[in-house]
Amino acid sequence: MTREHALKNAIAYFDDGHFLDDLKRRVAIKTESQIYESRKADMTEYMDEMIKTFQELGYETEVFENPNSKAGPIFFGSRHENSNNKTVLTYGHGDVIRGQEERWEPDLVPWELKVKNNKIYGRGTADNKGQHTVNIGALKSILETRGCLGFNSKILIETGEESGSPGLADFARQQKELLASDVLISSDGPRLQPERPTLFLSLIHI
């Protein structure tokens, strides 16, 4: 199987509506970390969504309690294929800012995915549920094409980024070996131009 086959599978994931179906399901979960105490059940639901999704892709999964008792759980997934392979750690966050329903247009609801004027609306579509849904789709397309990734994959999805990532630094220190990798891909950050993807090749103090 070739790179072209993998790209064809990835494009089909978007064109056949499966991407929107997956994203719709995730957007509907109200993971507002700024009011975490009232959203604990939603955070658990999102962790369950990640567990199911990644186990279907052959990952071992685990949900960790946050070292900060006032912050949400942390999801970790791992797919180890070969000790000689490089390991890629991918970061994302499942939490969103508050819905702020009163600030949305009358025909839009933050927890309901809607395509309008060729744009996708819903809380988390741009930050960050959309991004890690894209990443999941890419991993799936590779696995469907050749049955393996060709690298070892680790996934970290926190639920407190919109509140300053409480507990994440402590978690990283405690789980240094678990998170050890050769490459970090963090699909979260600013975009310099709306119509053009922005790629940062190196960052310090991560």
Model segments located where?
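Acidic/His- and Gly-rich active-site-bordering loop/insert found
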Residues: 2-123, 142-151
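Acidic/histidine-rich catalytic neighborhood of metal-dependent amide-processing enzymes
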Residues: 128-202
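Conserved small/polar residues in nucleotide/adenosyl-binding loops
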Residues: 204-206
